[in-house]
Amino acid sequence: MFAQPYDHSFNDLFNQYVNMETSAADGKDSALSDFDQLFPLDSLSSDCGDLPPTVSTPKRHQSPQPWSNDWSLQNDGAAVDHFAFHDTVHPSAISDVNLNNFEVPSRPTATHALSTSPSTPPATPRRKPTQSALITPKSIRHRSPNERRSHLRKQSFSPSLMRSSNLSKSRMAYPEAWAQQIQNFSLHSSEDRLPLSPPPSDVLIQHENMPTEHIMNQPRDSAEMPPQYDARLYHQSPSVSCHRRTSQCQHASNSTTLITKLFHLDSSSPSSADDMFSSSHSSDPHSISSWQSDPLHASSLSFTPDLQGQDSQWWSPMPSRVAQQQASYLESPTPVRTTQNVGNQNDIMQGGLMIQFNPSYDMSADHSFSSSNMLPATPQKFDTSFTTSQIHNVSRSPSLSPKAGTSPRDIHNGSISKPTHRRTHSRKLSGQSMNAPKPAKASGSSSRGSNKSVSVSFVNFTAHDSKKILTGVAPSGSSKTKARREQEARDRRRKLSEAALRAVRSAGGDVEALEAVLC
């Protein structure tokens, strides 16, 4: 019946309570046969391995002495108290404890459960825990209470499960309330969209995104559900806390068949809604402080991406679905609760792994949804808001990084004037650098008349070479030969003029009158 890696403490506890109910003098032998058909004790003891059930089976071995029967009953009760009211009891174990329709009588709990001495005959010696292995034919090994206590501490999943034991002491001992809680558990565990161990933010989002048809149709399957459960389940107040959801989802695949079979055996009348829902409110002070108990509004479901497998969507043309959506709108006033739900939606989007929207874009879309309930004009409003924001983004982006392909119609004149200034300035600089050697050539041509400046003009490896080479363009070979030939012609004319003047002087002529006539 059970898989091998399942909880051993759950098997032990269930086997104890089956045996305790058969040993009670109520005459419920039919229930015993039903339990033996459902859960044979051989398979339970063989599946458990190192941790077998710790109580002997009274069906297999009935002791002839009446005091030993009382002792085994008292021993079972002490072990029951030790298991049921321990600090770290599993919540699935508590649910199965209270399913079996018996209440634990008020008896003193013993710390060492298996070492209690019998009370009726005073001359009987103290029974040791190791002797109980000789009673059963299966030779079941017993463990000391300290080892069981350490094993239970290892099996506990989280410290938040400690509050469930106090629950079972005060209010959860009634089988009627637990029957309704098992029904509620079967309703919640039948969802296929819940993962095995989700983070708390994802659990909240998935419970928010539950479709309204799914929630409203599930309580109608059971005929004995009173009508006030529909409103409580539909509004989704935090009646079932976060850690109980995760623990129920973890053990839903293993213990669903067990719980449903036990639930069919127990035909009890349903209790009121206060017995069922007020206990989790009073026992879970640390459940979720930021989660408000407002009913789910449709605007909080608007932008979540988990709309893939759901049947009811915003644009569904079915008239029944539209009527249900409008009824959900009419139940609570919209303008008061839209702001709270928007805040909750932003918190959840920041906490979980979801796409974050711009707050202005988010608020505008929410108000367009909440102002017009199911009118066909809402997608038009939504599209216009989206397109206007897109246009603004397009007009802002070229001002930051202008491109050459953008037309000046979409861009302001001031944003494109600065790059043109820079381009003209760079062109002016390049023109000056190209025109820079021209004044150097002009200065060289103006210095041709003087004799001294010609010899100094193009000389390498001097202090003034940097200015001449870097500012102007270096002369080519043809220009050098041309300048050399011009220099040689000037030298020849100068020498000829000097020789003519010497000849005139040697002949006794007037040189100054000749220069005045020639010049």
From Swiss-Prot:
GO terms for biological process: conidium formation; sporulation resulting in formation of a cellular spore. Residues 108-118, 435-452 have a biased composition (Low complexity). Residues 105-165, 270-294, 301-320, 325-344, 389-452, 470-495 are annotated as: Disordered. Induction: A huge increase in expression is observed between the fourth and fifth day for solid and liquid cultures. Keywords: Activator, Conidiation, Sporulation, Transcription, Transcription regulation. InterPro entries: WetA. Residues 419-428 have a biased composition (Basic residues). Residues 155-165, 301-315, 389-400 have a biased composition (Polar residues). PANTHER family: DEVELOPMENTAL REGULATORY PROTEIN WETA, PROTEIN ESC1/WETA-RELATED. Belongs to the wetA family. BrlA, abaA and wetA are pivotal regulators of conidiophore development and conidium maturation. They act individually and together to regulate their own expression and that of numerous other sporulation-specific genes. This is Developmental regulatory protein wetA. It comes from Penicillium camembertii.
